[in-house]
């Protein structure tokens, strides 16, 4: 699988290395799996929501995913667009989001080699500007300048969307200042 295209490791994930049995979880068996979470054996839970259309059901599965991720590494297989983000904490187990088109769901074991480096207290800068209006009304327009880091060797630069956002911001500021 190709990082950033076929799968994304959630930014709050901890590192993990090894080969693990995969247990498929659904709304019928999750509680029995959670009860056995104290058993010391290599295990990853997998939730496949790629065929679920109902938003409420997907929301329930997302809650279940978050509950299970407190006790297990989680594979989340869905049709959702893979998006990178940032986190301000590290969980005990990784969560791997997998594009459903990239994987055959008939696997029973998975091999992982996840390294994680969390930079606590990282400082960044953004720019804020203000144009005084003629009346006592305010319009606040903002854009960010930073980017979202890396996952392994895959970089998530912010230059494209940030440059267009900052450009729009400057054009709006120019327009409203006239």
Where are these regions (language model features)?
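Internal hydrophobic scaffold segments of catalytic domains
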Residues: 1, 68-83
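Noncatalytic luminal/extracellular "stalk/propeptide" segments of secretory-pathway proteins
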Residues: 1-56
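Loop/turn elements at helix/coil->beta-strand transitions in domains of secreted/extracellular proteins
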Residues: 40-43, 70-73, 135-139
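Hydrophobic beta-strand residues in large extracellular and virion-surface proteins
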Residues: 1, 45, 74, 95, ...
């Amino acid at each position: 699988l190709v990082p950033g295209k076929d799968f994304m490791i959630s930014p709050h994930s901890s590192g993990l290395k090894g080969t693990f049995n995969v247990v498929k979880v659904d709304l019928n068996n999750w509680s029995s799996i959670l009860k056995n979470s104290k058993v010391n054996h290599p295990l990853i839970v997998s939730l496949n929501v790629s065929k679920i259309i109902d938003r409420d059901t997907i929301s329930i599965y997302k809650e279940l995913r978050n509950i299970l991720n407190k006790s297990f590494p989680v594979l989340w297989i869905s049709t959702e667009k893979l998006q990178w983000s940032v986190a301000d904490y590290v969980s005990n187990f990784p969560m791997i989001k997998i594009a459903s088109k990239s994987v055959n769901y008939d696997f029973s074991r998975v091999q992982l080699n996840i390294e994680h480096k969390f930079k606590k207290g990282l400082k960044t800068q953004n720019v804020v500007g203000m144009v005084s209006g003629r009346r006592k009304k305010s319009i606040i327009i903002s854009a960010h300048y930073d980017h979202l880091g890396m996952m392994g060797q895959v970089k998530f630069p912010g230059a494209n969307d940030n440059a267009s956002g900052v450009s729009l911001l400057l054009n709006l500021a120019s327009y409203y200042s006239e």
